[in-house]
């Protein structure tokens, strides 16, 4: 039996079989693009929801079937999409302002929009300016829609009633935060940390709650429009749902019974970080989650299903076991016994699969126990393969042949947390030389465009079912489409607090990508060979 036949049998006998029906099991090809990095002529300083629509058309034209985005949840004052203040609510910063109904009715609308659109010409996302300008516009806009009675719109009322499980806690939390000038929860007056006063908070901040509810309604409308367009064009949207949530979030504030303050999640020491990492993210109270039948998780999934056909589960191994730091700075896996962590992970992932039609894709990079990887296969859940890291680490250290990847996987040359391919080639020449030899290529210290294209082509021909690369790695095929300093093509440096994290802006506009003859010819050439 071939590996593909084995994978097919696994899928057919797995809890994920219903999730696979929409996508099918034939090879799929896609791009990963951070929404904040996009810009069109209408974008107001940051990528916006409706900027995805022309990219969907481009994907269909060139043979890409998947667009993967990073998390788009509301991250409050933080620029990291992985440090959200809500596990469900979308980020109003991504609203396409120029496309809002009645946007032109805002005082000095055209002048304000033009000023914000100029921010898209900066080489990076300038969050302070973007946030100040967009929030001012949204508040002016909201005053107008209140004036014309839009809050009485039946669709808005239906939305608020349907989504009240997460929407009410989010809007109250957001309102208190605004009232306290963005202060983190641990600095709030004691009265605001007691959710027994929740109904009183709703009354106290009624107008603010309505404002934040209406913004979520607008986010829902625009992302639903994107999803409908993607469906019509046979392009699948892939979201990103981190398994952990910020301690400064409405989830931890309101659903505190599902979280534990006994420790914080992180990563154990390894060869790259001898002290390990403390992410300062709260851990779950698994007992209470189970007792509540995973209602909190199911609510996240059911809302995300409005927008995505599949999604990345960041740090999926954490659903089995987490590296937990105690208050004394000591760390250990919880639980540590396979007899505990395998049933725990299997149970929650089975519940997750039953809760929606979306297909989860596991981010299982780093040190993952073999029994966890085997369990993911039995569940019908794909893992992730980064060719430069796929090596026989327990043996001779050689690279694993591209044709030997499990079909139940996604191949990606780079991630948002790594160097792009061309940057890694320069930063790690010894490793890159070994990689070139493995691929049968002549090594040069600087990765030539033709070699970049060859490696991209190979990445689309691995035995994985899914092949999804960062748009940065495709843009590098044309030097005029990337920064002269390749370090600015990197999206994030994990474990650092840096002004360069999460500010990456794609150099060309979406309009320029669509009309760049040399770039599009390169994409066509890649697809002609796979």
Curated annotation (Swiss-Prot):
<dbReference type="InterPro" id="IPR017853">
    <property type="entry name" value="Glycoside_hydrolase_SF"/>
</dbReference>
<dbReference type="Pfam" id="PF02446">
    <property type="entry name" value="Glyco_hydro_77"/>
</dbReference>
<keyword id="KW-0963">Cytoplasm</keyword>
<dbReference type="GO" id="GO:0005975">
    <property type="term" value="P:carbohydrate metabolic process"/>
</dbReference>
<dbReference type="GO" id="GO:0004134">
    <property type="term" value="F:4-alpha-glucanotransferase activity"/>
</dbReference>
<comment type="similarity">
    <text>Belongs to the disproportionating enzyme family.</text>
</comment>
<keyword id="KW-0119">Carbohydrate metabolism</keyword>
<keyword id="KW-0328">Glycosyltransferase</keyword>
<keyword id="KW-0808">Transferase</keyword>
<protein>
    <recommendedName>
        <fullName>4-alpha-glucanotransferase</fullName>
        <ecNumber>2.4.1.25</ecNumber>
    </recommendedName>
</protein>
<dbReference type="InterPro" id="IPR003385">
    <property type="entry name" value="Glyco_hydro_77"/>
</dbReference>
<dbReference type="GO" id="GO:0005737">
    <property type="term" value="C:cytoplasm"/>
</dbReference>
């Amino acid at each position: 039996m071939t590996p593909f036949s084995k994978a097919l049998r696994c899928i057919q006998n797995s809890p994920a079989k219903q999730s696979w029906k929409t996508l099918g099991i034939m090879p799929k090809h896609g791009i990963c693009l951070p929404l904040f990095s996009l810009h069109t002529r209408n974008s107001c300083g940051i990528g916006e929801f409706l900027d995805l629509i022309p990219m969907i058309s481009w994907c269909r034209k060139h043979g890409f079937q998947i667009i993967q985005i990073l998390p788009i949840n509301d991250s409050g004052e933080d620029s990291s999409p992985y440090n959200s203040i809500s596990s469900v609510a979308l980020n109003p910063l991504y609203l396409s302002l120029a496309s809002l109904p009645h946007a032109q009715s805002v005082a000095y609308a055209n002048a304000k929009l033009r000023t914000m659109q100029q921010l898209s010409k900066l080489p990076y996302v300038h969050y302070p300016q973007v946030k100040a300008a967009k929030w001012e516009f949204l508040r002016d806009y909201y005053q107008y829609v209140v004036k014309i009675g839009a809050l009485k719109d039946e669709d808005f009322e239906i939305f608020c009633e349907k989504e009240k499980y997460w929407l009410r806690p989010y809007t109250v939390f957001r309102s208190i935060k605004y009232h306290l000038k963005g202060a983190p929860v641990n600095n709030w007056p004691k009265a605001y940390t007691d959710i027994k006063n929740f109904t009183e908070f709703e009354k106290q901040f009624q107008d603010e709650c309505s404002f934040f509810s209406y913004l979520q309604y607008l986010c829902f409308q625009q992302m639903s429009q994107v999803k409908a367009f993607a469906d019509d064009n046979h392009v699948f949207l892939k979201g990103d749902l981190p398994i952990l949530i910020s301690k400064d979030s409405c989830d931890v504030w309101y659903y505190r019974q599902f979280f534990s303050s006994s420790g914080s999640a992180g990563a154990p020491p390894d060869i790259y970080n001898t002290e390990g990492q403390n992410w300062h993210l709260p851990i779950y109270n698994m007992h209470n989650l189970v007792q509540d039948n995973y209602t909190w998780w199911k609510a996240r999934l059911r809302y995300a299903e409005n927008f995505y056909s599949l999604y990345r589960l960041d740090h999926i191994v954490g659903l089995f076991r987490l590296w937990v730091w105690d208050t004394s700075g000591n760390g250990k896996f919880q639980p540590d016994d396979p007899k505990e962590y395998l049933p725990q992970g299997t149970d929650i992932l089975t519940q997750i699969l039953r809760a929606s039609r979306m297909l989860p894709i596991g981010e299982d990079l780093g040190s993952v126990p073999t029994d966890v990887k085997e369990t993911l296969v039995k569940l019908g859940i794909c893992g992730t393969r980064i060719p430069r890291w796929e090596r026989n680490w327990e043996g001779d250290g050689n690279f694993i042949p591209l044709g030997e990847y499990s079909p139940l996987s996604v191949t990606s040359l780079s991630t948002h947390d790594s160097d792009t391919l061309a940057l890694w080639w320069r930063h790690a020449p010894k490793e890159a030389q070994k990689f070139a030899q493995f691929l049968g290529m002549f090594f040069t210290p600087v990765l030539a465009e033709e070699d970049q294209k060859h490696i991209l082509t190979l990445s689309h021909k691995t035995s994985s079912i899914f092949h999804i690369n960062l748009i940065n790695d495709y843009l590098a095929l044309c030097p005029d489409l990337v920064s002269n300093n390749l370090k600015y093509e990197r999206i994030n440096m994990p474990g650092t607090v840096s002004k360069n994290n999460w500010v990456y802006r794609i150099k060309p506009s979406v309009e320029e990508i669509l009309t760049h003859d040399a770039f599009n010819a390169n994409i066509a050439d890649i697809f002609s060979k796979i």
